[in-house]
Amino acid sequence: MKENLGNTGHISRSYDEAMNEIQSKTLEMSGVVESSYVDALRGLINNESSLSQKVATNDFLVNKLEIDIDEKCNTILALQTPVATDLRTIIVILRIITDLERVGDEAEKIARLSLKLNYENIDPALLKTLEHLGNSTSTILHNSIDSYARKSVDQALEVIQTDKKIDLEFKSCMKELISYIVKLDDDKAVKNFLSISTCAKSIERIGDHAKNIAQHTIYLVKGKDIRHTSVEQVRSELDQD
């Protein structure tokens, strides 16, 4: 906001450039994180170790971007004291990069575990179930990032609604996993399936982070904190605005 910046055009331009940079960097980080998750999922389902190994490299970049964006946001807060929309933008970016970093961590965990799996002991039908859950989560992660990029409240609300379905799908997946585990009498095979269940949990958590990003987007656009509000109530309140 230019009222914070004094009277010189030079300072105003510097401020605008700084605000544009943190938003651009956030979208860059989003793209890296989304690619990491897609690679981790493909590596897990298709036993592609090269993709799983690639995720570790991306995780380093994700962490670097998070630190860079965080530092730039704090510099703006310290030197420019932004208000109104700009302040809300910075708050949202700081929240979003935290969720993105955690998505990156979960993707890295999936990749690391998949490298240790013994695929000979895994029923292909189980991998299909896991793939469906993973693809559903991939879709809402993409849509949550897109809702932020487009500042789309409707798209963000759709992400939040869809996350509930993913939670149900995760529970169904876990029941299927447990039904396999109870039939096993080999410790190595049990450990194998426990690793798969950990991957499934990571996928479900990524869906939760996607939901968070969608909630942050609504706060950015509407100034409403909806973290403890139902989608139906949010729609009703927004219709009254």
Predicted regions and their residues:
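Cytosolic, long alpha-helical scaffolding segments
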Residues: 1-241
